[in-house]
Amino acid sequence: MNKVVGIDLGTTNSVVAAIEGGQPTVITNAEGFRTTPSIVAYTKKQELLVGQLAKRQSVVNAENTFFSVKRFIGCKADEISEESKELPYKVIKDSNGNIKIKCSSLNKDFSPEEISAQVIRKLIADAKEYLGQDVTKAVITVPAYFNDSQRQATVDAGKIAGIEVLRIINEPTAASLAYGLDKKQNETILVFDLGGGTFDVSILEVGDGIFEVLSTAGDTNLGGDDFDKALVRWLVEDFEAKEGTNLTKDIQALQRLTEAAEKAKMELSNVEKTTINLPFITADKNGPKHIQQELTREKFESLCQDLINRCRIPVEKALKDAKLDQSGINEVVLVGGSTRIPAIQQLVESLTGKKPNKSVNPDEVVAIGAAIQAGILAGEITDILLLDVTPLSLGVETVGGIMTKLISRNTTIPVKKSELFSTAADNQTNVEIHVLQGEREVVSGNKSLGNFKLEGIPQAPKGKPQIEVTFDINVDGILSVTAKENESGKEQNVTIQGASNLSESEVNDMLEEAEKYAVIDKEQKEKSEMVVSATAYCDEVEKKLNSGEMGECTTEEEEEIKNVIKTLREALSSANYASIKESFEQLRTLTEVHLNSTNPAN
């Protein structure tokens, strides 16, 4: 079977890893880095950029540079309305209430799944190059607290990217695989995973090849992005108080502020104070305005104190659900770049009574764990048993707007459970099954995963028909629901797809479009490389001509070469690629003999 890779599809950065020689290995990307920014951009020339290249141009192309999209995947527009207001790019609601990301350079709206798919495509392309073989299958990680909609949407993103997602695995569980792969002695570990946009806590028993999740808790709207936003708000308010200008109206200024806030946050993990320096942040009739602001670690912590406090509740909840106190935890493993914040490390130590284990790289450990899971599925790693849990309770709406739970949170998956229900009125011939996920008793307090109808129920007094509802959660944590009327045998079976916001046909259409753009992007890359090569070749030939190093070249030949260079330069300046190719080939034919004659033989 082809190599199966593990992908940590992160909010801020993404990582891909694979099993090499029996060991998990992080794959270096085309730019030479082990992490790839989860950023996608479309330039004014409609060129697609992903990762580091997209990040570099984000200030000058802020409205077409899309980052932190993972926070929107599998969500409805109303769920993220406040958060979307703080972004330099536009997030809109379509006619179905779904999230769309507006791309003005293409005059097109993208779903979050499509943007995430471009990040996955980049990771897969880098993996193919590194491994020297085709890659068509992957294990992708998600936050443990992702609901069914978000998990299904992640699978859809993989499909749009053109890969088969063999398994969805929870990020803390993946981290535990990486940490505990060689552990023989049983340990109870707490994984504290604070990334760019999400926060999870999982408690697991690890040892002798068995990884059993005891409990999980989290917050899918808490991460490093929120710390950055707290700093941006402080800078904006301070600047407005001093200068009377609101910088949030300026897209480029907002992007510069965001980048400066992230940089300052990272610096304060190592030093006690830093300076945020943003010259020419804006201008008015009196001239240019600048920001030069000192920020201490103490001030940063006070600005983010409410965010730090929010990290406390899931830890306490996970311990309670696992029926453990501090003494029951042997090791604490930190995951995610945001765990480098000293105040976070201090909080973890105070809650667990343990100094965090720093033997794993918090940026890479999840991808390594995903690669181990990929290796298990590909048969490259054996003797590993992974027992994960569902993070949230699942149930159906019953009379009075109440949620009746069929599967409780922290139930080991895969799992299948059934319960009998009946009709609420005499001679009722159909029932609507409203599937919910969450912990509240009332329907309105939970996430709606979808509705479907069971038709053809024989007429009978209310309460007599027996309708068996079965919930089946697979190893990816994705739910299928079956409703069956026992007397007639009428049955309706659905995988909860509506919650992912994309239909199967939409996913297929997006895959076709992504593949079409992949061809266009390849052509654009080839054109760009040709321009670079042709320009460099012109420079080299002109240098040789001017220094008299063109070998035995007649005056007529020199004149012909100069004319071709002139034609090629004109083609380059007008971006006439057909003419560039023709003139470049002509120039090489004319000059190769003379250039080679100036190079001594080896």
UniProtKB/Swiss-Prot annotation:
Q: Biological process GO annotation list?
A: chaperone cofactor-dependent protein refolding; iron-sulfur cluster assembly; protein refolding
The record's principal subcellular location, in a coarse class, is plastid
List the GO terms this entry assigns under cellular component, sorted alphabetically.
chloroplast; cytoplasm; mitochondrion
Does the record bear Nucleotide-binding in its keywords? yes
Cite the GO molecular-function annotations of the record: ATP binding; ATP hydrolysis activity; ATP-dependent protein folding chaperone; heat shock protein binding; protein folding chaperone; unfolded protein binding
Q: Which key words are in the record?
A: ATP-binding, Chaperone, Chloroplast, Nucleotide-binding, Plastid
InterPro entries recorded: ATPase_NBD (IPR043129), Chaperone_DnaK (IPR012725), Heat_shock_70_CS (IPR018181), HSP70_C_sf (IPR029048), HSP70_peptide-bd_sf (IPR029047), Hsp_70_fam (IPR013126)
Report the SS bond pairs. Answer: none
| Location in or out of the cell | Plastid, Chloroplast
Q: Which residues cross the membrane?
A: none
Family classification: Belongs to the heat shock protein 70 family.
NCBIfam families reported for this sequence? PRK00290.1 (NF001413), PRK05183.1 (NF003520), prok_dnaK (TIGR02350)
Known role: Acts as a chaperone.
| PANTHER family given in the database record | HEAT SHOCK PROTEIN 70KDA
- The name of this protein is Chaperone protein dnaK
Q: Which organism does this sequence originate in?
A: Thalassiosira pseudonana
Gene designation: dnaK
